[in-house]
Amino acid sequence: MTPMRATIAAVLLTLFAISANSEDAPKENAYVTELIQQLGPNAKKPAGEVFKNVQLMKDVPADRFLRIMDTGYRQSLGVSCDYCHVEDRWEADEKRPKRAAREMILMMRMINKHLGELTEIDSQAAAVNCTTCHRGYVKPALQMR
């Protein structure tokens, strides 16, 4: 499985899990919905062509990229966009959480790649994502409750 496919699979798994119970499913951030509408015809262009400084997921359509940022990251960590981003300077890399998120994406890809190589599990369905560890909190739980 390619790193991009592993990332997309993990994000889709997260989105599916969140939407499984529509009453409990988090609603899309109104700001993200507005941004997607403002994209107009650029919504289906690759994120790397639409946004500045996209280093990972460059080929993901811009509208899906924003939804991944919203559901896959913001909601998975229980934060707002400005936790990682400087508002109105989204491309800026000065915040440590944004740089850490990139490292975590690479770690997630590596784990998902190795999950796909395991022979004693259903590797087609096995995937980890941000929610796997973070569960809505910035700091993952390090012990069972």
Give the predicted meaning of each segment.
Residues 18-22:
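Sec/Tat signal peptide C-region and signal peptidase I cleavage site
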Residues 1-8:
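Bacterial N-terminal signal peptides that target proteins for export
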Residues 23-145:
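Sequence context surrounding c-type heme c attachment/ligation sites in exported
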Residues 9-17:
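Bacterial N-terminal signal peptides
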